[in-house]
Every structure is written in structure tokens, then in C-alpha cells.
């Protein structure tokens, strides 16, 4: 029997009344000059306009940004100040790597459950194009010392100690701080450990692009994606530019492995690309939504987060978090209408799919007597996944939530699982319900 109830003390559910995102654009394309904070303001402003809600009714904004910009460390507060909300609106930022906007949504939901707010906005935005480029440790130390000198001679002595190498810019780190391993290296390890072939990975990537292309062509995605006019406002973007509308399985086989050149199977094509974009959802106390006459997309029925070791299988978070959320809600895998899993890499997604069905893995790692269950692939990532749409780190969770709720509504309702892996061995899982 499930023990988790996402309800207020009066028994009201937490409703999601709106979801919106920018188009997702590959690094250094349409959003090449747009920082994450502006992507966040862009999508929240449009959401407020579309819902026609008085911005001053928003009581809390929880937003995230994985690649932090030093000049705007609290993206949530900048969004409040830049979108016409009440200046007294509470706003704070969170980060849970690729599961950031799931965390943001949970935080707002918990505020509603506690009765401290009735309406809130959650989401995330990231730019892989506008990045904080750092300096070497030696240059940083010398610049600090330089600021404390008083004479020209002292300044010259400090500057003379610097080499050309010390002056080189330092890009943001792509590896785990604790292990030095990149996500791609972990995906390679998971492919080898769990027997995920190159052909299987390429097939999933092709499936993702094919289904995403079909969803766009059938008009299923347009309603949740705004048209953006990035500076200098001469062009606009209204669709994701990573989706391959001409995807062929043969095309994937041409690419060389990206992380293990000799024996690897993870390529740029069967992985998510670096992406720019923002996404948000609006949550309300169920009664408040009805009082305001808002259409309810659906409800959060349950959620769970997980944390595992980072040395091996670091991206197995969906399996661990899903086991927890199903236990929390008293559901079985067979109860689900849809399953949407973040595709950081085809290898990672397929390894998780495999472990969902493994009794041995469940007994040794999940504290379960039997497997979570074998995933019915007719329910899995039915509109394509992150490999096709792209992955602005903090925005992906909100994209998945909105996309899933709208698809459930098209199908006449049901229950769905959203789940994602995240850096640091973290995982997230959320159960959504549409009546």
C-alpha cells in the first residue's frame, strides 16, 4: 500500500495548470547569444501571457540553472524581477543536475502541500552557448594579489611570474568532480557492463528522432513550445532544431565512437547534444485552480529521488528512483499508461530498461524480491526523447512533464512515469495523473 499522498492538509491535490518551453536549440545556433536567465524570463513571460493570470498572484518561483552564471546566481529571482510579478514574490534557485526542474516542481508542490502558497512556477533553463569561461588558478591568485599591490614594481613582479599557459581561458568542467569521469565515459562503462550493443544504441536514437519528427508533423508539440525572437530580433525559432526529420538507421553507423575511440559504442548521434533552452510549469492548489477557472492539465501523484555511487553505473538513477516512487504510491509498472525516461545517452536509457526487468538487480540493489518489471516499449518515450529534442540540463524535466501530461490528455487520461538520471549518481522519478 502506498504511503505518499501529494495533497494539502485539506485533501486537495497539487494541480499542474500550464506547461511551456522555448524551442530547444543546439549549442551555438539560434540562441547563441542568449544567456539562461533570459531564456527563463522568456518562457515564464509567455506562460503568464498565455494563461492570462495576474502575475501578482504568483507566490513562489523555484527555478534552476545547472551551468551557473556568476553575474546571475539566483535565476529564479531574476525571473520574478523581469516578468512583472510582485516584487515580494518568493524566489529561489535549485540544482539537481539533469533532474533540476523535477526538483523545482517538487519544491513548489511541497509549498502548496504545506499551505504556505497556493500558486507557484517551477522550471529551469540552461545555455551551452553562453558559458562562464574561467581563468587558471594561478592567474586568479595573481589577480587577487595584484589588487592589493601599491607600487608599479610590485605589480610588474606579479605579472612577470605568469606564463602564457597561465593566461589561457578555462572552460566549464565536463567531468564529475569526485571521479574525473565524464558522463560519456560512464555511458560507455554502462554499455560494456550491461551488454548494450552499438546497434541497439543506434536503433534507440533512430527511434527517438523518428517519433519526435512524427510528433512535430502531427501537431502534437506545437502547443507546448513558444515562438522565440532572440536578439537582435531579426529571426525567430519555433521548433527544436536538433530533431532529424530525415533520420535513417544507416546514417548512425557512420559515426565513430566519441569517448572510447577503439572499443567504444557511444557516439555523438546516440547521445544528447549540448542544447540551449528553457521550460516551466505552473502549479496550483486544486481548489484554487478551479476557483480561477483554470484548465487542469493533470496532477502530481508521487515523486522520489535517489542517490548511488559515482564510480560505476552512475546513470542508473531512473531504476533506483522508479523503484522508490512505485513503492511510495502503491503502483506497479503495469498500472502505467506511459513511461517517459530521459535519454542522456542511448546506452544509459537501455541499461536502465534492462535493469527494470532484472530480478537479480532488484534483489541485489533495490531491496525488492522481484524486478520492477519489463517495460512495454509501446508505452516508452512515445513522442521521442532527449536524444531527439535536445537537453538543456535544467529544462528537461519540465519539458517531460508538460509533454507527458498533454499526451495523457490526448489519450483520455491515465497515469504516467517521468524519470531521469543526473550527475553525481542522482535520480528522479515522478508519477503524473490525468483524469
Curated annotation (Swiss-Prot):
Q: What is its EC number?
A: 2.3.1.16
Q: Which GO terms describe its cellular component?
A: cytosol
Keywords (A to Z) from UniProt: Acyltransferase, Cytoplasm, Fatty acid metabolism, Lipid degradation, Lipid metabolism, Transferase
EC top class, in one word?
transferase
Q: Which GO terms describe its biological process?
A: fatty acid beta-oxidation
Q: Which domain of life is it from?
A: Bacteria
| Pathway(s) per entry | Lipid metabolism; fatty acid beta-oxidation
Question: MF terms per GO, please?
Answer: acetyl-CoA C-acyltransferase activity
Record bears the keyword NADP: no
Q: Where is the active site?
A: 98, 391, 421
User: InterPro entries this protein is in?
Assistant: Ac-CoA_C-AcTrfase_FadI, Thiolase, Thiolase-like, Thiolase_C, Thiolase_CS, Thiolase_N
Q: Which cysteines are joined by disulfide bonds?
A: none
> Gene3D superfamilies given for it?
3.40.47.10
Reactions this protein catalyses: an acyl-CoA + acetyl-CoA = a 3-oxoacyl-CoA + CoA
* Cell compartment(s), UniProt: Cytoplasm
Show the NCBIfam families listed in the entry: AcCoA-C-Actrans, FadI, PRK08963.1
* Subunit record text: Heterotetramer of two alpha chains (FadJ) and two beta chains (FadI).
What job does the chain carry out?
Catalyzes the final step of fatty acid oxidation in which acetyl-CoA is released and the CoA ester of a fatty acid two carbons shorter is formed.
Which family is this protein grouped under?
Answer: Belongs to the thiolase-like superfamily. Thiolase family.
Put simply, this protein is called: 3-ketoacyl-CoA thiolase
Amino acid at each position: 500500500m502506498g504511503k505518499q499522498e501529494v495533497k494539502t492538509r485539506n485533501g486537495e491535490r497539487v494541480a499542474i495548470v500550464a506547461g511551456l518551453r522555448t524551442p530547444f536549440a543546439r549549442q551555438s545556433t539560434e540562441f547563441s547569444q542568449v544567456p539562461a536567465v533570459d531564456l527563463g524570463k522568456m518562457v515564464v513571460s509567455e506562460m503568464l501571457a498565455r494563461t492570462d493570470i495576474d502575475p501578482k498572484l504568483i507566490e513562489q518561483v523555484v527555478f534552476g540553472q545547472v551551468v551557473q552564471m556568476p553575474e546571475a546566481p539566483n535565476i529564479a529571482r531574476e525571473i520574478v524581477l523581469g516578468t512583472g510579478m510582485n516584487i515580494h514574490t518568493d524566489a529561489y534557485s535549485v540544482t539537481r543536475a539533469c533532474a533540476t526542474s523535477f526538483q523545482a516542481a517538487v519544491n513548489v508542490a511541497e509549498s502548496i502541500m504545506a499551505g504556505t502558497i497556493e500558486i507557484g512556477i517551477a522550471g529551469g533553463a540552461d545555455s551551452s552557448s553562453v558559458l562562464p569561461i574561467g581563468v587558471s588558478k594561478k592567474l586568479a591568485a595573481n589577480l587577487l594579489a595584484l589588487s592589493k599591490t601599491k607600487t608599479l614594481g610590485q605589480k610588474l613582479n606579479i605579472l612577470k611570474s605568469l606564463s602564457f599557459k597561465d593566461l589561457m581561458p578555462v572552460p566549464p568542467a565536463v567531468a564529475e568532480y569526485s571521479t574525473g569521469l565524464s558522463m560519456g565515459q560512464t555511458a560507455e562503462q554502462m554499455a560494456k557492463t550491461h551488454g548494450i550493443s552499438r546497434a541497439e544504441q543506434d536503433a534507440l536514437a533512430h527511434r527517438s528522432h523518428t517519433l519526435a519528427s512524427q510528433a512535430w508533423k502531427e501537431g502534437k508539440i506545437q502547443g507546448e513550445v513558444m515562438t522565440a525572437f532572440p536578439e537582435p530580433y531579426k529571426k525567430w525559432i519555433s521548433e527544436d532544431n536538433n530533431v532529424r526529420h530525415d533520420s535513417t538507421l544507416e546514417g548512425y553507423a557512420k559515426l565513430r565512437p566519441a569517448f572510447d575511440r577503439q572499443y567504444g559504442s557511444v557516439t555523438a548521434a546516440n547521445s544528447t547534444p549540448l542544447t540551449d533552452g528553457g521550460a516551466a510549469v505552473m502549479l496550483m492548489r486544486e481548489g484554487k485552480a478551479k476557483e480561477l477557472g483554470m484548465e487542469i492539465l493533470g496532477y502530481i501523484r508521487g515523486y522520489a529521488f535517489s542517490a548511488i555511487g559515482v564510480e560505476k553505473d552512475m546513470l542508473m538513477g531512473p531504476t533506483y528512483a522508479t523503484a522508490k516512487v512505485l513503492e511510495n504510491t502503491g503502483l506497479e509498472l503495469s498500472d502505467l499508461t506511459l513511461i517517459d525516461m530521459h535519454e542522456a545517452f542511448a546506452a544509459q536509457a537501455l541499461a536502465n530498461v534492462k535493469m527494470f526487468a532484472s530480478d537479480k538487480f532488484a534483489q541485489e540493489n533495490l531491496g525488492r524480491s522481484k524486478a520492477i518489471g519489463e517495460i512495454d516499449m509501446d508505452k516508452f518515450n512515445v513522442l521521442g526523447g532527449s536524444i531527439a529534442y535536445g537537453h538543456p540540463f535544467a529544462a528537461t524535466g519540465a519539458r517531460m512533464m508538460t509533454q507527458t501530461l498533454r499526451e495523457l490528455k490526448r489519450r483520455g487520461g491515465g497515469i504516467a512515469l517521468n524519470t531521469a538520471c543526473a550527475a553525481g549518481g542522482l535520480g528522479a522519478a515522478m508519477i503524473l495523473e490525468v483524469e
